[in-house]
């Protein structure tokens, strides 16, 4: 069976078996000879997965790609169409949308083709490296743009008008820094530090976190620090202090109202409480989604590079990568389309979307800080 070729479905249930593969068939048996140098020896220990996994993952990736094109494309379109959205903060958001859009449009078509055309990598070895590099650049860039967005929100909400203002120039610099960090983290394998190889069920390519040598170990520790640990610290720091600042502000207002012998300084206390709850929930959702998407892949990579490859099966390796790529679908909705100003732009420029957002203005100065906080969060 070592020379088996063609779709894996043809071998599923062979040799008088109702389910599974004949004994001795490896997941690597279906890989073309010129691709095998890009397959780590670890995967030779596993039989192919049920072919239905390939079809299921192909359908899921097609869905993710469609949602990403719609969501991120809409954000980019509205940014270019509406002058009101072309703010410094939204420069970061539109770069996030661009990065996410590139990730899905450069990865999804090839992954789904592999899923439906044989269940293994069907393209050249060189494009395996390009595929992995593009996924790394856009993934890391999105992570750091989320850090920049989180820090901007922290600066606005915690420092208010006393903090340094985010100008268009600064926003462009922050976006460029994110792209430079991403490129700097993704290019080393082309120069001998680390490797890009096939991973999991061999439908896609990514970092090599299985080879046990100092070269691979040092590169993976480098990307773990710059792609996960530092961004996680910045995002958690930002949102923890955002929530603390909001509740401290509300406590100060209640104390001031008590000194003035009034029940509240607000015209509508119920609305204020709802705004506080919304801000806290938004912060919790932002942090939780980030960790849900990126932590499994980071832990699997760290487990492999530390030498413990037990339990890293083809599916265990593949599913965290799916979670990581799914962030490109929710980002445009969490960071842009859910915002009232984006919904207003949809109402104005795409009325057939049936989004009916009305422009509101508040004249109550006592609510200014919370209004800014609610918009930014």
Swiss-Prot record:
Pfam short name (any one): 7tm_1
Cytoplasmic side: 79-90, 152-170, 247-281, 339-377
Record note on modification: Phosphorylated on some or all of the serine and threonine residues present in the C-terminal region.
Domain of life: Eukaryota
Keyword set, alphabetical order: Chromophore, Disulfide bond, G-protein coupled receptor, Glycoprotein, Membrane, Phosphoprotein, Photoreceptor protein, Receptor, Retinal protein, Sensory transduction, Transducer, Transmembrane, Transmembrane helix, Vision
Single Gene Ontology BP annotation: visual perception
Record function comment: Visual pigments are the light-absorbing molecules that mediate vision. They consist of an apoprotein, opsin, covalently linked to cis-retinal. This opsin produces visual pigments with maximal absorption in the blue-green region of the spectrum.
Origin organism lineage: Eukaryota, Metazoa, Ecdysozoa, Arthropoda, Crustacea
GO molecular function: G protein-coupled receptor activity; photoreceptor activity
Organism expressing this protein natively: Hemigrapsus sanguineus
Record carries keyword Ligase: no
Subcellular location: Membrane
Main location: membrane
Entry's Gene Ontology cellular component terms: membrane
Disulfide cysteine pairs (residue numbers): 128-205
Transmembrane segments: 54-78, 91-115, 132-151, 171-194, 219-246, 282-305, 314-338
Family: Belongs to the G-protein coupled receptor 1 family. Opsin subfamily.
Record keyword rRNA processing present: no
Tissue: Expressed in all of the seven retinular cells (R1-R7) forming the main rhabdom in each ommatidium.
CDD domains documented for this protein: 7tmA_photoreceptors_insect
PANTHER family, per the entry: OPSIN
Residues bearing the modification N6-(retinylidene)lysine: 325
Protein name: Compound eye opsin BCRH2
Entry-listed glycosylation sites: 3
Extracellular side: 1-53, 116-131, 195-218, 306-313
């Amino acid at each position: 069976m070592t020379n088996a070729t063609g779709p894996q479905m043809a071998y599923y249930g062979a040799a008088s078996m109702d389910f599974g593969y004949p004994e001795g068939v490896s997941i690597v048996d279906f890989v073309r000879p010129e691709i095998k140098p890009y397959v780590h020896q670890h995967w030779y220990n596993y039989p192919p997965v049920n072919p239905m996994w390939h079809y299921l993952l192909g359908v899921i990736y097609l869905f993710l790609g469609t949602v990403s094109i719609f969501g991120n494309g809409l954000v980019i379109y509205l940014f270019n169409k509406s002058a009101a959205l072309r703010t410094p903060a939204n420069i970061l958001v539109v770069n996030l949308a661009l990065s996410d859009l590139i990730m899905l449009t450069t990865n999804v078509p090839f992954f789904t083709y592999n899923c439906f055309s044989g269940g293994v990598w069907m393209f050249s070895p060189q494009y395996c490296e390009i595929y992995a590099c593009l996924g790394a650049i856009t993934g890391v860039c999105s992570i750091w743009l989320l850090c920049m967005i989180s820090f901007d929100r922290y600066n606005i909400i915690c420092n208010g008008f006393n903090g340094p203002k985010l100008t268009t120039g600064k926003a462009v610099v922050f976006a460029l820094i994110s792209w430079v960090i991403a490129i700097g983290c993704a290019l080393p394998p082309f120069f001998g530090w680390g490797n890009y190889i096939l991973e999991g069920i061999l439908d896609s390519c990514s970092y090599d976190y299985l080879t046990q040598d100092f070269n691979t170990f040092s590169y993976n520790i480098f990307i773990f620090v710059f792609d996960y640990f530092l961004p996680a610290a910045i995002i958690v720091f930002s949102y923890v202090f955002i929530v603390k600042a909001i509740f401290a502000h509300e406590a100060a207002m209640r104390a001031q109202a008590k000194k003035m012998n009034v029940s509240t300084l607000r015209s509508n206390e119920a609305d204020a409480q709802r705004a506080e709850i919304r801000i806290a929930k938004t912060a919790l959702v932002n942090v939780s989604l980030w960790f849900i998407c990126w932590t499994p892949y980071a832990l699997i990579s760290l487990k492999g590079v530390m030498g413990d490859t037990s339990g890293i099966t083809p599916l265990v390796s593949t599913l965290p990568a799916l979670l990581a790529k799914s962030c490109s679908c929710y980002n445009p909705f969490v960071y842009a389309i859910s915002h009232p100003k984006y919904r207003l732009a949809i109402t104005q420029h795409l009325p057939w979307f049936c989004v009916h957002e009305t422009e509101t203005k508040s004249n109550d100065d006592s609510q200014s800080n919370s209004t800014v906080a609610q918009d930014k969060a």
